[in-house]
Amino acid sequence: MNLKVLGATGIQVSELAIGTWKYHGGVEPLQVGIEGGATFIDTAESYGTEQTVGEAILGIRSRVFVASKVSPRHFRYNDVIRAAECSLRQLKTDYLDLYQLHWPNYTVALAETMAAMERLADEGKIRFIGLSNFSVAEMKRAQGCLSRVRVVSNQVKYSLVCRDPEDGLLDYCKANRVSLLAFSPLATGPGVLARADGGDVLGQVAAEVGKTRAQVALNWCVARPEVIAIFKADRAEHVRENCAASGWYLSSEQLARLSRGVKLVQNRSAIEQFGRRVARRLVQYAGRSLGNPTAMDVEGRTSVSDTRPGAPGSR
């Protein structure tokens, strides 16, 4: 498994991370992934999977890089603190490696939220601060609210069929030493990739390098040094397949051929598509208790797992 430096932290993490959005595989596939080198695990308070992740990393905490997210309905200062502490209990750990704002919340001052994040960092409860589904402008605002630490990552949708980050976000991340964490690197499964790849360029390249189509698609995604791809798989065999997408390199010609040959079928920014919907829902969910922070999905995302149970897919 290839390693990459996360943002400007100097810390190396696996270039393929295991995602747990709508994950139902239990402990074993996560542990298989860790053994396969995917020691970066991503979860969130709204996923309902933090407890499973905590069980999977029990006794091996120092070997893994654990990321979680605070939901936008918990962006008030005290709510951020309580949400983080709840995640720590669920994960059975005393610190998070990366804590991310899951979506922008336009009803709470960003400075208030970031002040709480900075306090968590000062107290050692989180090591690094990240964002998710933030635009370039929102990233700049978030960083401007921090006085002592830096934003190290932004998690957004990115794949062969959804390349919105190439319209400025990737360039900004590269210039500012921010890692782009790509969710849905396999789109919504092989069916979507097949429809976008009418000439079967993926199949041709896969045959050339002796890999599967999914492995080629993942390898294309992490070819950029600033990108880390987050895959999801409920079955151990699919986790192994995804982990084998790292440790080798496509040629520049193969990368270009894939970019030309696979058409874009999801070309609306996830931020543009869901941002306003999320903002409207925040008021509805604002009064919910932190006692059950994983009970609902406030992000409005659809499942991106393969139609086959546990197939190699992404968050």
Region locations from a protein language model:
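Short, well-ordered coil/turn segments that N-cap beta-strands
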Residues: 11-16, 37-40, 61-64, 93-97, ...
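Acidic (Asp/Glu)-rich catalytic clusters
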Residues: 7-8, 54-62, 85-92, 121, ...
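Acidic-and-aromatic substrate-binding clefts and catalytic sites of carbohydrate-active enzymes
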Residues: 23-26, 42-52, 73-78, 106-109, ...
